[in-house]
Amino acid sequence: MKFAVLVFPGSNCDRDMFNAAIKSGVEAEYVDYRETSLSGFDGVLIPGGFSFGDYLRSGAMASVAPIISEVKRLATEGKPVLGVCNGFQILTEIGLLPGALLHNDSHLFISRNEELEIVNNQTAFTNLYEQGEKVIYPVAHGEGHYYCTDEIYQQLKANNQIILKYVNNPNGSYDDIAGIVNEKGNVCGMMPHPERALETLLGTDSGVKLFEAMVKSWREQHV
């Protein structure tokens, strides 16, 4: 298995994503936003940061980068796509995930560890966690308030697309939502950073199982 780790101007978690992929036992390669092909890749990791300086709004300029059409193609083919923080914002901007990310209710940048609950462990991203398991991931965002219409929220609930919730909501997200998947279950976006939760020495290794789950799910289908 080989992951593409996208790199935009202003990305700052691409190395963490790369490290997470390698740690889970697969290959990874950085892919510049100006590239036009993801041929040979089995999945996509879209890192956090401030792509294009967050001008216009978070993820807006990245959403029209040349590589995005290929991200959409892989998603349509059912390959795993994970967007974290700014990556989540990009996924909503390009329509692969519903909703939007707004300014935190506090209007402050929040950077700390947060306790989260796995509310759906039947996905390619969470199948190594227990249902209801509590995990610790770092958060680092100013625009992490997940918002959607009531209609979309009911669809998310009905399709079991909400996978991760905040235990103590730090940003005002609708129903404490921290992470969701698309209807097919192969595209995931979350504001917390599992790629920064790989070592107990750094405070938490709760994120290891998320990347291992992605690899496990892929191998079950292809090996």
Curated annotation (Swiss-Prot):
This is Phosphoribosylformylglycinamidine synthase subunit PurQ. Part of the phosphoribosylformylglycinamidine synthase complex involved in the purines biosynthetic pathway. Catalyzes the ATP-dependent conversion of formylglycinamide ribonucleotide (FGAR) and glutamine to yield formylglycinamidine ribonucleotide (FGAM) and glutamate. The FGAM synthase complex is composed of three subunits. PurQ produces an ammonia molecule by converting glutamine to glutamate. PurL transfers the ammonia molecule to FGAR to form FGAM in an ATP-dependent manner. GO terms for cellular component: cytoplasm. Its main location: cytoplasm. InterPro entries: Class_I_gatase-like (IPR029062), PRibForGlyAmidine_synth_PurQ (IPR010075). One of its GO terms (biological process) is 'de novo' IMP biosynthetic process. It is found in: Cytoplasm. The keyword Mitochondrion does not apply. Pathway: Purine metabolism; IMP biosynthesis via de novo pathway; 5-amino-1-(5-phospho-D-ribosyl)imidazole from N(2)-formyl-N(1)-(5-phospho-D-ribosyl)glycinamide: step 1/2. GO terms for molecular function: ATP binding; glutaminase activity; phosphoribosylformylglycinamidine synthase activity. The active site is at residues 85, 193, 195. Part of the FGAM synthase complex composed of 1 PurL, 1 PurQ and 2 PurS subunits. Its EC number is 6.3.5.3, 3.5.1.2. NCBIfam families: FGAM_synth_I, PRK03619.1. Residues 3-223 form the Glutamine amidotransferase type-1 domain. Keywords: ATP-binding, Cytoplasm, Glutamine amidotransferase, Hydrolase, Ligase, Nucleotide-binding, Purine biosynthesis. It catalyses: N(2)-formyl-N(1)-(5-phospho-beta-D-ribosyl)glycinamide + L-glutamine + ATP + H2O = 2-formamido-N(1)-(5-O-phospho-beta-D-ribosyl)acetamidine + L-glutamate + ADP + phosphate + H(+); L-glutamine + H2O = L-glutamate + NH4(+). It holds the Pfam family GATase_5. The keyword Cytoplasm applies.
